[in-house]
């Protein structure tokens, strides 16, 4: 481990050693699109397993500052929700230093159906606990409390719309169609605003239990039904098991009856956020962008939004025809 002095990894290591008064003895870059590292540091006899979560930046479609997630993690930890312990916030390079929690992501990797069901039950209990939290500490930290049915339904969608409008390189009829539909079909709800994870269903687990809730950068105050919708979108990439069972479990824990049309509406809203965020990247890709990966994300979540809209309006869609592969100089890469 001998990074160059001006290398980003070297800066991270130097900051950690200075902040913790420790010596970093191992460092591994996480294989993902945002900068992140797994590290081990020694401080006297103590051995610290660490994780540095770097800033995704606006170029990757982000709309929330990383400080937002740091404050969220602080407040959830204080409230007894299982989240990683925080060690500090680094200004350059920007990132959150936290505990490397034991466990793994992706419930599809559970050892068997019993473990999958046990973890799912535990997560739904945690989600119910999160939705029952007092919102005042989050409001004091800067989260905006919705005061109208439109704000409850649309949540942070206007933020994503503005970001898309500022960055878009060309018109996109699909995005315009879904956005207009969402504004025209704002649903009624009797739910009180709650803290919602937004991109729910992200956690680490071990031996049948959730060890930490993670990836809370999109969290806000809004309709708790939004987190049931978030489980659906997460399930597209990381299968979460029987979501009907999970939703029933949540209803029992909270003692409420969920309106499936509310969950459907939030599924459309949250699904289309991904295409809104990455369309400008697809149209003007920065160097080294995995363009095909972004294109896949665009169509997976755009299709999800359209299919749920069709379900809500009782329309029957023709199944898409398989696309024949076409050879090109780039085929070998994919």
Identify what each model region corresponds to.
Residues 14, 68-71, 125, 177-180, ...:
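Generic recognition of well-ordered alpha-helical segments
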Residues 21, 78, 102-103, 125-128, ...:
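Residues at helix-coil transition
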Residues 8-23, 133-197, 207, 255-258, ...:
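An alpha-helical support segment within catalytic cores of ATP-dependent transferases
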Residues 87, 258-269:
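All-alpha amphipathic helical-bundle segments outside canonical DNA-binding/catalytic cores
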Residues 225-258, 269-288, 303-312:
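Active-site activation/catalytic loop segments of kinase-like enzymes and analogous catalytic loops
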Residues 276-334:
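ATP/Mg2+ or Mg2+-diphosphate-binding catalytic cores
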Residues 32-41, 47-52, 86, 94, ...:
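Active-site acidic catalytic loop and adjacent metal/ATP-binding pocket
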Residues 28-155, 159-173:
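ATP-binding pocket architecture of kinase catalytic cores
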